[in-house]
Swiss-Prot record:
It is found in: Secreted. Disulfide bonds join 77-181, 198-206. This is Somatotropin-B. Pfam families: Hormone_1. It comes from Xenopus laevis. One of its GO terms (cellular component) is extracellular space. Residues 1-25 form the signal peptide. GO terms for biological process: animal organ development; growth hormone receptor signaling pathway; positive regulation of growth; positive regulation of receptor signaling pathway via JAK-STAT; response to nutrient levels. Keywords: Disulfide bond, Hormone, Metal-binding, Secreted, Signal, Zinc.
Length: 208
């Protein structure tokens, strides 16, 4: 018992990004601008992920679906398999390079799943936005270290065997869980980027 189409997602995504400037891969710009662009990208991706999650919940997660969730397997977020900090105190204990590499790993872990979920992001450029942020983080790593762009190795393929079937309650709940993971991970990336920027550029209004 699946409600109508996902047309509302297209409009939502377009509105979310219509005012975000496209700076591509952050070519030859000062460090402050690299940080500002990366933080803005992460902020908008987190906002987008939260809006899509809420819209999906309103559209698909009915009371009947919620009742059936008691017997459904909960989706495990891939990010639980990497030692990325999950709270403010632990985040501040990590080095800049640790936070950048955690961010890079989280972004890269969503490149394939976002393509599989593309029909939920109709007329959007979520994948391209992830790629832009990936390039921005790589540029920061090059600037702050020796050009080594390694991220943390995937202990397993992120969200392998991803089968999207929205014709069943279990399928609807699986997508719901994935969108929740996407939202949480984009929040982490946004937080990490803000922490690093604040370390380099003491800003009076910078609150983490």
């Amino acid at each position: 018992m699946v409600p109508g189409s996902c047309s509302s997602f297209g409009l939502l995504v377009i509105l979310s990004f219509q005012n975000v400037p496209d700076v591509g891969g952050f070519p030859n710009v000062p460090l402050f601008s690299l940080f500002t662009n990366a933080v803005n990208r992460a902020q908008h991706l987190h906002m987008l992920a939260a809006d899509i999650y809420k819209d999906y919940e309103r559209t698909y997660i009915t009371d009947d679906v919620r009742r059936s969730s008691k017997n459904s397997q909960v989706v495990s977020c891939y990010s639980e398999n990497i030692p990325a900090p999950t709270d403010k105190d632990n985040t501040h204990l990590k080095s800049d390079m640790d936070l950048l590499r955690f961010s890079l790993t989280l972004i890269q872990s969503w490149l394939n799943p976002v393509q599989a979920l593309h029909r939920l992001f109709r007329n959007s450029d979520v994948y391209e936005r992830l790629k832009y942020l990936e390039e921005g983080i790589q540029s920061l790593i090059r600037e702050l270290e020796d050009g080594n762009l390694r991220s943390y190795s995937f202990m397993r393929t992120p969200y392998e065997r991803l089968d999207i079937n929205m014709r069943t309650d279990d399928g609807l709940l699986k997508v719901y869980g994935l969108l929740s993971c996407f939202k949480k991970d984009m929040h982490k990336v946004e937080t990490y980027m803000k922490v690093i920027k604040c370390r380099h550029f003491a800003e009076s209004k910078c609150v983490i």
